[in-house]
Regions:
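A glycine- and Lys/Arg-enriched "phosphate-lid" helix/loop adjacent to the NTP-binding pocket
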Residues: 54-126, 135
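Conserved nucleotide-sensing/catalytic segment adjacent to the nucleotide-binding pocket
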Residues: 1-25, 38-61
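C-terminal alpha-helix
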Residues: 135-143
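Surface-exposed helix-capping loop/turn segments at secondary-structure junctions
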Residues: 19-25, 116-122, 145
């Protein structure tokens, strides 16, 4: 539990580094005059909400410093993946049982319902999920670029 804030700090530094490099790119031969007038979207697979949910799921609590950081950060769109695909083992995944997966999914959904930013549930087979994700991102970024 004590390591979670250290992990959260690393997450914040990583996000800020990526966003800063996108907003202030270095000149190159292909792009001699970088501009932040039309920045590209940044996709973040894991953010502080994942640390919060995991902490609450495993330890039944979350460090207040993490909650404060969540309240102070802004994200424009979340894609919440449903658990309707079979579980596939890899070195980062835990909880192969359906009951735990359902419980975690509801933790994430409850978190998103109680936030003030848009989110889209992604479900279906792999192709349907990809298309839903593309559609959700396009609906968000295309009106901003007009």
């Amino acid at each position: 539990y004590e390591d979670l804030y250290t992990i959260a700090e690393g997450q914040i530094k990583g996000e800020e580094s990526i966003i800063n490099s996108m907003m202030h790119p270095k000149p190159s031969t292909l792009n001699p005059q970088p501009s932040s007038l039309n920045p590209q979207p940044v996709f973040i697979d894991t953010d502080l909400s994942v640390i919060k949910v995991w902490s609450e799921f495993v330890f039944n609590k979350c460090d207040n410093s993490i909650l404060t950081q969540i309240a102070n950060r802004t994200y424009h769109l979340y894609l919440l993946c449903n658990i309707d695909l079979p579980w596939v083992k890899d070195e980062l995944r835990e909880y192969p049982d359906l009951e735990s997966r359902e419980k975690l999914y509801h933790y994430y959904k409850d978190f998103l319902i109680n936030q003030h930013f848009p989110w889209v549930e992604i479900s279906g087979n792999y192709e349907e999920r990809l298309q839903k994700g593309i559609d959700a991102v396009n609906q968000f970024i295309l009106p901003q670029r007009r």
